[in-house]
């Protein structure tokens, strides 16, 4: 993200590979807030297969346009409701947030690589120089 110092507005490219990878990876759940200018994706509450009284919500915040581990933050919230529909919500620390983050980074790298390969001006640095 670029910071425009005059306005305090952050510029985030929606064509960014991490943004696109996140949207693709979160397509299994409804999204409640997708703000590309603010660099955030928030899912709606959704229930895991085996639990009707527990729901989770995923937040993905983009801190950079670059494909880097410190350029993205994934947070997961869990809501548990009792039989009287009283609910408690808390942020959870689990391996799931790290797994989602890694999946986004891997998918973003794959997207970037495929775009480079299809770019006619791209020269593969691994290719041997045949000029003598």
For each predicted feature, which ranges?
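Ser/Thr-rich, low-complexity intrinsically disordered terminal regions
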Residues: 1-132
